[in-house]
Each structure stands twice: as structure tokens, then as C-alpha cells.
A protein has these predicted regions:
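Hydrophobic alpha-helical transmembrane segments
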Residues: 34-48
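Transmembrane-cytosolic junction motif
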Residues: 53-77
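N-terminal membrane-targeting/pre-transmembrane regions
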Residues: 1-36, 141, 148-150
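Non-transmembrane, membrane-adjacent beta-strand/coil modules in membrane-associated proteins
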Residues: 2-3, 73-148
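Cytosol-/stroma-facing membrane-proximal "stalk/adaptor" domains immediately downstream
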Residues: 143-165
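A short, polar/proline- and glycine-enriched secondary-structure boundary/capping micro-motif
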Residues: 17, 81-85, 162-165
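Alpha-helical transmembrane segments of multipass membrane proteins
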Residues: 30, 52-53
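Short aromatic/basic micro-patch
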Residues: 64, 80, 153-155
């Protein structure tokens, strides 16, 4: 059995700036709304707090690899991808400029969620599930061996798939 390898997700500069700015704006808005008082102000402040808190549970924390499967860990759960069902492809970085967010974050706590984008220079839209916090480095695209499965983008060490132990 191969040893388990771990990769702690790094944040790129845009993710750090975006997350910090959004949290500052939400904090100021929540304080202002609660100081105003009134039911609608408190409801709006609560919705803003939920907007700030829920992504903490959706962003990936780390990725592990045991030679047979990739495990993406989140705060309260994990997703397991068997490499018998996917082919890993290392990509230099992925661009979100021509991508459409279906239910996704474009930098707030990373680039997680469901995206529609052109992959590998193909001239058709692909749907992919992204669990990344950096789009500049260590991006792995899991291409399904069966058409019925979705494509997955995550951060992991590209050397895991190019060297033999």
C-alpha cells in the first residue's frame, strides 16, 4: 500500500483580497444594520451573516492521495474520487474569464462550485465541479472515463501523477 500524500490548499492573491474585502464589507453592513434596529434590518443582517458563514463550509481545505483515490476535505465532510473512474490531467492554471458560474464562487474563499467553461482548448462548453482555492498553481483536472460523470477541478500536487514510487 502506498503512503498517503497530503496537499494543503493554498490561496492565490485574488482569493485573499476578494475574501478579505467581502468580509470587511459584510462586517460593516451587519454592524450598521443591527445599530439601526428594526425587524427588516435584523433579517437583512442575518442573511448577510449567512452569506459570510456558509462558504466556510463549502471551500476545500486539503487534498489527499493514496495511489488509488483522491480525497478532497472540507470543514465538515469529504469527497472521494476513485482514479479507476477518472483520469487526472495536470493543467498549468485555469482561466475563469470565459467561464459561467452556475453555482460557484469566483474568488470568495476560492473557486468552488459548478462552472460552465471551455476546457483544453475545445470549442464546446463543459460543466465542471471545482474545489480549488488557487487557479494559478497545482490544478488537477479529473476527466471522467464515463460520460455520465462530471469533470472535477481541484488543487493537488501534480508530481503525484507523474512519478512512480
Amino acid at each position: 500500500m502506498k503512503p498517503i500524500k497530503h496537499y494543503k490548499n493554498k490561496w492565490d492573491r485574488f482569493t485573499i483580497i476578494m475574501t478579505t474585502l467581502v468580509l470587511i464589507v459584510i462586517t460593516i453592513a451587519v454592524i450598521a444594520l443591527y445599530c439601526e434596529g428594526g425587524l427588516w434590518h435584523q433579517v437583512t443582517a442575518t442573511v448577510l451573516l449567512l452569506f459570510a458563514i456558509i462558504p466556510i463550509f463549502l471551500r476545500p481545505l486539503s487534498t489527499s492521495y493514496d495511489g488509488e483515490k483522491l480525497i478532497v476535505r472540507f470543514l465538515c465532510y469529504k469527497k472521494v474520487y476513485s482514479l479507476s473512474q477518472y483520469t487526472p490531467v495536470y493543467i498549468e492554471h485555469f482561466s475563469t474569464t470565459k467561464a459561467v458560474r452556475i453555482f460557484a464562487s469566483g474568488g470568495y474563499f476560492g473557486y468552488w462550485g459548478i462552472w460552465r467553461m471551455h476546457l483544453n482548448g475545445r470549442d464546446r462548453w463543459d460543466t465542471l465541479h471545482s474545489y480549488t482555492t488557487s487557479r494559478k498553481e497545482d490544478c488537477i483536472l479529473l476527466m471522467p472515463k464515463e460520460e455520465s460523470k462530471h469533470k472535477v477541478l481541484l488543487n493537488a500536487d501534480g508530481r503525484w501523477f507523474t512519478t512512480t514510487d
